[in-house]
């Protein structure tokens, strides 16, 4: 065959142009980078805001991933907006973690965050129905999604409700500043990332990598203290100590003991359920995981929540 130098140069230029565009798209965000579902985010941006010379992602694959997330987390309504709100709620960065601790922040960090929020707000304004090849297609359906598993215990309804409420509020933000204020208030009230959205955790230790990961327990049995009958003195002691702890006053470590089935674990869950909204979180650590405790403390030391380390079966 004949090697066409001119065509080869054009092809290289085209590939280089595509790479530059792809790089530019990925780097337009300053703080909100490395999103939990970054590839899906990028692909949706490419579908909704196509650029010349850019390869078109598989729209059906994107729809499938968003629907999978909706089933996993129980999302309803406009799934595109829910996905964007989920990205905002989960991304731990300099701005979001600062807001979790002190609330609204000013100065350059706030200005940099507004740069990102302006772009996300623009994404909220884009109509996913434009992706439909036919009238009343899959994307139109995803704008008014009804969750078939509404009464299911397969997902955490509290987390779902917060994400859906955030998405609706952001949809109606009339300015970049209002958009930023809504997200900032969310961070201050609930926190950000896994510690903001979840109440209970366990640890996973990677012996080879010498790494300790704190993973959410997504479904915690909703037991209330009023469900525990006949333990009024014990409940009073737990309540008094827990309230002192979350208020920053002196508190003690607690040892719960008794026969199997007497309510020890139920008491722990009930305390967690009652005080979660006031910032209480709980991390379950087993006896064989004690050597990873220092790594756990290192990961939670700068968060705005109050953490109880729950050690089960100390025998």
What are these regions (language model features)?
Residues 251-267:
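Walker A/P-loop nucleotide-binding motif
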Residues 270:
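Active-site signature of alpha/beta-hydrolase-fold catalytic machinery across serine-
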Residues 274-304:
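AAA+/P-loop NTPase substrate/partner-engagement loops
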Residues 21-229, 233:
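AAA+ P-loop ATPase mechanoenzymes
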Residues 283, 309-310:
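Hydrophobic positions in the central parallel beta-sheet of the AAA+
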Residues 221-252:
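Pre-Walker A (pre-P-loop) alpha-helix and adjacent loop at the N terminus of AAA/AAA+ ATPase modules
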Residues 312-314:
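Walker B catalytic acidic pair
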């Amino acid at each position: 065959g004949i090697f066409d130098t001119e065509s080869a140069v054009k092809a290289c230029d085209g590939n280089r142009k595509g790479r530059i565009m792809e790089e530019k798209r990925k780097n337009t965000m300053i703080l909100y980078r490395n999103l939990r579902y970054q590839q899906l985010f990028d692909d949706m941006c490419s579908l909704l805001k196509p650029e010349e010379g850019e390869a078109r992602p598989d729209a059906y694959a994107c729809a499938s991933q968003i629907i999978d997330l909706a089933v996993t987390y129980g999302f309803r309504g406009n799934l595109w907006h829910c996905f964007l709100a989920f990205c905002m709620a989960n991304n731990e960065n300099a701005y979001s973690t600062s807001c979790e601790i002190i609330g609204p922040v000013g100065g350059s960090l706030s200005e940099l965050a507004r740069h990102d929020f302006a772009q996300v707000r623009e994404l909220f304004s884009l109509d996913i129905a434009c992706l439909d090849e036919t009238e009343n297609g899959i994307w139109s359906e995803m704008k008014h999604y009804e969750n078939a598993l509404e009464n299911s215990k397969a997902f955490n309804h509290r987390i779902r409700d917060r994400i859906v409420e955030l998405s609706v509020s952001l949809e109606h933000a009339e300015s970049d500043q209002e958009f930023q204020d809504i997200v900032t208030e969310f961070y201050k009230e609930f926190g950000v990332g896994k510690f903001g959205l979840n109440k209970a955790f366990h640890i996973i230790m990677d012996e080879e990598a010498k790494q300790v990961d704190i993973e959410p327990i997504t479904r915690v049995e909703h037991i209330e203290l009023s469900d525990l009958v006949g333990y009024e003195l014990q409940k009073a002691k737990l309540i008094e100590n827990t309230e002192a702890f979350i208020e920053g006053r002196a508190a003690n470590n607690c040892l719960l003991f008794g026969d199997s089935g007497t309510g020890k674990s139920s008491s722990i869950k009930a305390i967690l359920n009652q005080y979660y909204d006031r910032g209480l979180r709980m991390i379950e650590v087993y006896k064989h995981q004690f050597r990873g405790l220092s790594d756990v403390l290192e990961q939670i030391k700068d968060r705005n929540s109050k953490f109880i380390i729950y050690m089960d079966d100390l025998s």
